[in-house]
Amino acid sequence: SLDVYLNETTRHADVILPAPSTLTRTHYDISFTALACRNVARFSPPSLPAAEGERAQSQTLLRLAAVAIGNGMSAETLDDLVAAELARQLVADTQSRVAGRAPEELLAAAEPLRLEDRLLDMMLRAGPYGDGLGSFPDGLNLRMLEAHPHGIDLGPLQPRLPEVLRTPSGRVELAPAQLLADVPRLVEALRRPSNGLRLVGRRDLRSNNSWMHNIEPMVKGRNRCTLQVNPADADRLGLVHGAPARVQSAAGSVEAETEVTDAIRAGVVSLPHGWGHDRPDTRIGIARAHAGVNSNLLTDEVPIDPLSGTAVLNGIPVTVVPA
């Protein structure tokens, strides 16, 4: 495992390789830029220098991948292969600004960059606002973003449909045959009377992910790992706000503090995911002091969604009684 914590997941690893601080590496937000209300591009250099002898996370990942591939491949060779494959894909994409160019041109333009910075530079050049290897002199590349540390505002969002669609019809296919074929099963399930309670998950602003539970400012204050219950259900079941309740499913049971609230509808109870930090073979002291309960213990491995084949993690049938 590559992690800064010995937690409930990494305890299963034979070796845990420590990851350096995120403040010691460059950053370009790809995921959340897709949620922005304007087109922006921003590159952040490392805020802190890496410790002597410390390897970048990407270097470690490349070394592990090279070992898995075998043949004596080095991390540096694999880095070059990844970059070459990306260059090939970008010049083959008819929508990119480097379409039809030689992959070697794109690789040469990104020199002497390595690792993720090289990949980023090539993607910027090929993207809809890129320099297109000089075809658009005012377009983006990594060097330009480094010269604008506060980022570049590229203007309002632009329509991209149907340009980016890759469906056979060239349209947004909202009713594929597989989905329509599954509708009768869904309708029949909705008509069946619902007996008992259904368990759903939730997130809290200060604990979106489990690693946040090992940071004191994120977990201080009220208990956030509670079982939310509608007042009508609480009265019917004899549950008291602040008192423990036992939640039982076909797979297992947990005990959690009851939170009576009208924020959840009758017939439904809610436990947040990512808690249950009471394992003795971990080293996350702050999280253990705010352990909560592991809602995964209530999920059954047998039921799956027939259409997608994924596990059922919401809408789990449960019973709840005072603990």
Segment roles from a protein language model:
Residues 2-8:
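Short, polar loop motifs at secondary-structure junctions
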Residues 45-50, 54-127, 210-228, 232-323:
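Long, contiguous, secondary-structure-rich segments that constitute the structural scaffold
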Residues 5, 21-22, 66, 146, ...:
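A broadly conserved detector of short glycine/acidic/proline-rich loop/turn motifs that flank catalytic sites
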Residues 89-217:
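Long, low-complexity segments enriched in small/aliphatic residues
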Residues 9-10, 26-28, 51, 175-176, ...:
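Short helix/loop capping segments that flank catalytic or ligand/cofactor-binding pockets
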Residues 40, 162-164, 171, 196-198, ...:
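A residue-level signal for beta-strand positions that form part of recognition/binding surfaces
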